[in-house]
Amino acid sequence: MARVAELAPQPRLDAASLRPLSFAGRRELVVAPHAEAWSDPVEIALPRQADVAVQLHLLRGPAVASVHLGSRMRSWAVAGNRVDAAAWPEAVVEEGWWHLAAVDVRASPRAVLVATGDSITDGYGVPSGSYQRWTDALSRRLAAQGRDAVVVNTGIGGGRLLRDGLGPSLAARFERDVLARSGVTHAVVLIGVNDLGVSHRGRATTPESRAALLAELQAGFADLARRARARGVCLIGATLMPYAGSGYYAPGPENEADRQALNAWLREPGRFDALLDFDALLRDPARPARLRAEVDNDGLHPSLAGYRAMAAAFPLEVLERRCATAR
């Protein structure tokens, strides 16, 4: 059983907004392993940028649960069937969200921007429930200017473009997490640092293996652009920001050269419908292989100030454009 409502001061719900969820008219369902199930539509009036809570009662939970640990959000767990309750004073706080794959809002904004990628989009370093990811700051900026546009974040920490990591590769999930989102008009793709980093972490590389990886990444980005254009979605690329200060990847000169080579390719005209040069925005001019101190968290991820800078640099006029379906 499940219900949806607007979240009040946590962990409470706005009782007046509590609505039951059904699945093909039934309150209960069985979801097969690795499958997903959409609920029937439900009418609920929500203010812009409201928090939405989904209550789930599991009669029998799976041995291994689906979870987005890097959601930068909290969940609350209680024993028994409490889907009709609006408060749970005895709830146990859990980091991340569990079992829930998406919430689809059937509004009709002029622009729907889906931002996807790895932990930088996922918001590494952002305190839970604080909404300080770069996409959160961009959403507030759009709202403050009265823009008829919304932002959807489908980043997954540890994600890679080509191969599965902490979740499926972006190439594999691009349809589900970007192109299939309701009303999507634009998408931002910021990914590749884990592809480069994992390729050399704890292993030897050769000029041939590095060249092969770059060619694979270029082909992967080109395929995303082709798939987006086939659906009339404007694809916005993004350069990879520097990470020489990362203790996790500890990149050497060869890895930095690969990042520079990939960024040069990403910057070439025609690769995307627009480009965000986050490398130029956040790098240290005196040490271009590293992030500037004021926007650096851990040598790999931006700080909260860095996320704000990314949002402030986004060219809002891009969202006024429309991209014709490629034939």
Locate the predicted segments by residue.
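Serine-esterase "nucleophile elbow" of acetyl-processing enzymes
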Residues: A85-G157, L162, L166-G167, A171-G183, ...
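Catalytic His-Asp segment of secreted/periplasmic serine-dependent ester chemistry enzymes
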Residues: A171, S199, L240-R327
